[in-house]
Amino acid sequence: MDMTSCVARRTRSRTESYLNSILNKSKGISGEEEDQSLGCVNSRTEKRRVNMRDACSPSPRKKKRRRRKDDDDDVVFVRTEYPEGKRDDENVGSTSGNLQSKSFDFGDRVCDFDADDRNLGCEEKASNFNPIDDDDDVVFVGTVQRENDHVEDDDNVGSASVISPRVCDFDEDDAKVSGKENPLSPDDDDDVVFLGTIAGENQHVEDVNAGSEVCDILLDDANLRGEEKTYVSDEVVSLSSSSDDEEDPLEELGTDSREEVSGEDRDSGESDMDEDANDSDSSDYVGESSDSSDVESSDSDFVCSEDEEGGTRDDATCEKNPSEKVYHHKKSRTFRRKHNFDVINLLAKSMLESKDVFKEDIFSWDKIAEVDSREDPVVRESSSEKVNEHGKPRERRSFHRVREKNHLNGESFYGGEKLCDGEETINYSTEDSPPLNLRFGCEEPVLIEKTEEEKELDSLWEDMNVALTLEGMHSSTPDKNGDMLCSKGTHDFVLDDEIGLKCVHCAYVAVEIKDISPAMDKYRPSVNDNKKCSDRKGDPLPNRLEFDASDPSSFVAPLDNIEGTVWQYVPGIKDTLYPHQQEGFEFIWKNLAGTTKINELNSVGVKGSGGCIISHKAGTGKTRLTVVFLQSYLKRFPNSHPMVIAPATLMRTWEDEVRKWNVNIPFYNMNSLQLSGYEDAEAVSRLEGNRHHNSIRMVKLVSWWKQKSILGISYPLYEKLAANKNTEGMQVFRRMLVELPGLLVLDEGHTPRNQSSLIWKVLTEVRTEKRIFLSGTLFQNNFKELSNVLCLARPADKDTISSRIHELSKCSQEGEHGRVNEENRIVDLKAMIAHFVHVHEGTILQESLPGLRDCVVVLNPPFQQKKILDRIDTSQNTFEFEHKLSAVSVHPSLYLCCNPTKKEDLVIGPATLGTLKRLRLKYEEGVKTKFLIDFIRISGTVKEKVLVYSQYIDTLKLIMEQLIAECDWTEGEQILLMHGKVEQRDRQHMIDNFNKPDSGSKVLLASTKACSEGISLVGASRVVILDVVWNPSVESQAISRAFRIGQKRAVFIYHLMVKDTSEWNKYCKQSEKHRISELVFSSTNEKDKPINNEVVSKDRILDEMVRHEKLKHIFEKILYHPKKSDMNTSFF
């Protein structure tokens, strides 16, 4: 027991004496009688002090054990009164014996309390005894245990031998039935609380509740001031001891009540007793004998439990039997989670009736349970210090968290809609709320472009960082903390103007010269400095006006250039597009509508028009071009009902593009289960609370059909909904998706290229012939796949296209002899498709971006890796062999992730397999991992981010583990891992984080199939491709993720290969396919020819690695921009 508790008990004793004196004066007792009465009180007080001293001494903790309750447990000892002549030294009110075997004689007056009923209402049940004199109405109400005391075993249940009794004496006449207490002295009221009143001889039990106001007292062991809180009620009298906002646990009086607290429900709080949980008085008096056995036990009478999930709980309701005048308690079961469904039903009702929902309707359920949070700080402290049965502090749960958790279920229902509350808006969006803009209204700082001198200086510092990194690489005694020991014991630092603060005895540099602030007197302001500042910021007014006029975004094209053309539908947009986008815009209009002149257009378009293909290089703005076209097309043909089909990873990109350019046209994403807010009101009203996937999709389809809007859907979902012919309930989806679209847009249009696939067959059944195919890599593997794509885009020319490509494929199979004929037929095919295929080879990227450098790096494997590569069984399945070859060429331990054949088990052996397990985190045992880890570390010193591609997730995870072990990095911070199993929303967060220049991410490990199309990864300037794939377009798409509009740095591409493997042969075949693709889809415009000048002439990171003494042995050969002659050369 601490000092605070001792002082509190001493103050309580003084307060009792003071109250006794006031009571005696009110009764007219003389001083002598008062002294006699004080003698008895002093005797009891002295015994109480002895108990208090015993309680101050710590007692050994005993193992707590729960026992089964007996029928006599509801008998509680109240007091002992001695007639005249009894010894005064007997223990007054001792309750150390077993309660169930004791019955005390009070001289024909017995007081039996029902423990269970007292637990419910925190009040005592008084027996019917007649007071003999004026002091008989002073009773010993009960004892309150110390906070850490528990029931120990079966023999001392309800023991209070170590408890200091607390006695409160009240005059029956002074205690008002209306619940008003006598005011306490301001000096001595710290420990006294009003517990209640006991009916007298001639007063009926029910008269206690005759008043309309009943006192509800807040009692807590630590509430030393004994503050009262009065509530207005008709019948309820309750004593509450909780100050928690969320639980309102009940204070248990007496020794039996502490047994309930120390039981298994102790850590979840005591029973909730609020005004709604009690319909009648829960503490009525029932006169029974002490040996009565038909009293209901607390287990069957009232049980309250509350799980942490906000689950079920039992509320006690009281029913009165008029004949017996006994209150029986009946359990009623309610569900706390029912509120979630109430909110959902309320929101659904508001959606159906199109009316607002007010806060008081939604949150009215929790008004009753809320407690005034302005309680005394001492009470708060006491509540937080309560312990559970395991001796651990009880977890304090915030009430607003429970409300927030309940609201989440409602949010998931209506998918981010907004409900109005008068003028206040309640946003239930499940999207993460945007961060607060603390600089709102402030002028954004102007970015000052560095001068050539500053750029050169930065380049020198980066070179120095690379040199320092290479110098400390692969050291025999690496230092984890970055501190070097000096040869002289301690460093002696001097300032070198070129290096910094370095040691004179060793090469250790404590502070680099770039981090040392120069003396201020060297840089005093001058006239030249003022001129530089005025040039960078605060330009004169004419210069600023001239700059604004040159901004393409603020320029509105004159009507002379666009009058009478389709550009008039989107004024001010033409000059914001690149030249190849302007050409593509007019090309689409000519193919779909026949002309670009408004007066020649009709409501149905030109007869005989068909689809077209926009074959612009990846990263040149095909999505932006298509959005502008749809905006203009819907202004002329608002009932055309365009539908966009794209890979699932690009649906979010389309939504962002439509929102970014302020098209003001609804975009309904069929893959999302959230309503956009632009859906048709009548269609939404038909939901009637049904949030099934297909129900929401049908609402979007109906809204798309009724309004001028765009429908977006992914390839897999379109295949699922449109291909089900016989499934019940799916025919309507098929009919709407196949027959209703008036314009079809296929992003990554090369996806449906296999005529045996279901998606290709479904798309051939689409009724409209107005189709737009977007693809930067139209030629994939062979001419047959190209023919399938061209026939989908132009169904009217299907026969002509098929015959021409069939002849071309024959020539390609003849080898070298048929190469001349092949080139001639490619020219004919190119001329045939020129009127519906618009090609741009990406010259805009070479003109506007810093540059691109592509190279093939051939590496020498170490001994262990080469041994595993040589023992791979080449006679197995082709796909299994390719997987093992790609995995082992990265690191030999990846062989354990493959399925070995019987031959491989015999050749490699268990001993080698055990060695591979130990080599997993040793990155230097694999030549590709050795190159990659060192390359990433060096790139980090020059603040360049690395993008790593691989076909296999096991390979990416191994690299991540090695980076964590070697560089002490963390996944999600410095390392990002993105593959097909990552959710779409998480992918977008990773992309945004990686593209931020000031983020801590250093490397992105990406799956080739999941991250090679449609996304922008311009944050990376170094791209490493670990595997060689057969399809050349896969690598082209992967490279275009970094080399695209928005890139600020020169981009370097590294194709890693291992010497003496089949990777080089695969790369040569891939390059041949790429050559054919360039022949077919080359631009006929001389201005659009690719630039052959090598923009990037130096790769300082790779050059430093090749010259480094400990790294140069891993390099066999490096080919920059491999030529045709290199494809026919085998240097392995």
Curated annotation (Swiss-Prot):
Enzyme class: hydrolase
Residues annotated for ATP binding in this entry: 616-623
Keywords of this entry: ATP-binding, DNA-binding, Helicase, Hydrolase, Nucleotide-binding, Nucleus
A GO BP entry: positive regulation of post-transcriptional gene silencing by RNA
InterPro entries: CLSY/DRD1, Helicase_ATP-bd, Helicase_C-like, P-loop_NTPase, SNF2-like_sf, SNF2/RAD54-like_C, SNF2_N
Keyword flag Zinc-finger: no
Compositional bias annotation for Acidic residues: 243-254, 270-282, 291-309
EC number: 3.6.4.-
One Gene Ontology term, aspect cellular component: nucleus
Gene Ontology MF: a single term: helicase activity
Kinase is among the record's keywords: no
Biased composition (Polar residues): 92-103
Localization (cell): Nucleus
Entry function: Probable chromatin remodeling factor.
Complex and partners: Interacts with NRPD1.
Protein name per the record: SNF2 domain-containing protein CLASSY 4
Lineage: Eukaryota, Viridiplantae, Streptophyta, Embryophyta, Tracheophyta
